[in-house]
């Protein structure tokens, strides 16, 4: 296999892979527990509280029309921290704006609305209680703020803000719910304290759910739609099953999800942002995916609680509402939560992506520019792979030198391709030319290239991050197509330096001639950060190849003059 053919194969593999990433379906091969099966607690979990002994379908999802009919107007509390602005009604987080993430770079642009009470595309996070043994529980309208009509704001001298709600039943049972916010943090601690002031035991289980109507533009995958590049759907994590996911478009495949999990979490992902329920490690829950009309729901049911008269108990969970910031996610110390930065569903590619981002983030801390960090990453990778690349360049230089002899062989054997191939291989063997010399370095770069693609697509840290001049957002495509045009020029120049094999098939030769144009068109639709990587990498490759060819030519001239033996 010659170098030109290797480049051709690599090019078509790249195009095919990107097309697969654009149109391919995300499949999960998971074994789900039947929705009709009664769930108990795994004895190996050794949990204090049990998962409710119920069928997954025993508590049907209420229709939106039913909720509107039974729920009177509920007082809504406004809360503002340094990073979030929210609306709470005690039962749900109805809306959440991300104050540090504007929708665009335009002056005065509004912040990203992650949770929203938009009637067309509602997206909320809810936690409540379901009765067992006819115990009274709060409904949508009965969690009341302790200080009605008060708006809460995290003051400049505050690091912590607590927003309390309370529910009290006629029989003396009460639940005090607190939402705790911390400065600079997107994880909200929601804590319920149940006090039984009645005369009979109180039995109920807690549920926590995320519910949204997906916006159409995240369901329609297209190379011109940045929001569809990333995975959009539900993900969950367990000790046994690891990281699993289900796209919105495939939400109820295999019957949804119905599984008992301890020590995990569940989330809804979209481009750059996510919401997640993170329960206590020592409590098991029933993990569910369900649909209610146009709503997709990710829910945790359980644990169940029995509170004796005169006693009290507490349960708490974290609700993440925010961006996929690697540093902040790491600080939560939740196993597997770093996978929401979804570089790949494949563990190896995800690890490569995490490593590339680690290097990029450190380069950015030194250079204070994500674009120059990408340039620095290219330089480091070229240095690391130079020993491998040197063989590729030397092979190309030798191939270029022996092109006239290969052409002579082709003319000598004419249409007898078998004899021509035999003579060509004998020449390669005699002159110690390795036609596979350019293959391995290119194969090494393929996983790096694809992992970097997902790093640039997924990393919210690069969102709206400029490089210089016309590149003002490295996660969107080049607005003036300058980088794709540069890529065409660089690939064309590289082809001119690379010898065309004498025995190359004419059709393959024509395909190689149009390959720079194909790659240029493809680069017009990828993030400009990836196009920058490819242009810098190709430019360095061109310079090194030119230098190696020149060095080899000088060496050959000196040897022919007798200066080198």
Curated annotation (Swiss-Prot):
Record's keyword terms, sorted: Cell inner membrane, Cell membrane, Chaperone, Membrane, Protein transport, Transmembrane, Transmembrane helix, Transport
InterPro entries according to UniProt: Membr_insert_YidC, Membr_insert_YidC_N, YidC/ALB3/OXA1/COX18, YidC/Oxa/ALB_C, YidC_ALB_C, YidC_periplasmic_sf
Keyword Glycoprotein applies: no
One Gene Ontology cellular component annotation held by this UniProt entry: plasma membrane
Molecular function via GO: membrane insertase activity
Cross-referenced HAMAP family: YidC_type1
Homology family: Belongs to the OXA1/ALB3/YidC family. Type 1 subfamily.
Known partners and oligomeric status: Interacts with the Sec translocase complex via SecD. Specifically interacts with transmembrane segments of nascent integral membrane proteins during membrane integration.
Protein name: Membrane protein insertase YidC
Species per Swiss-Prot/TrEMBL record: Xylella fastidiosa (strain 9a5c)
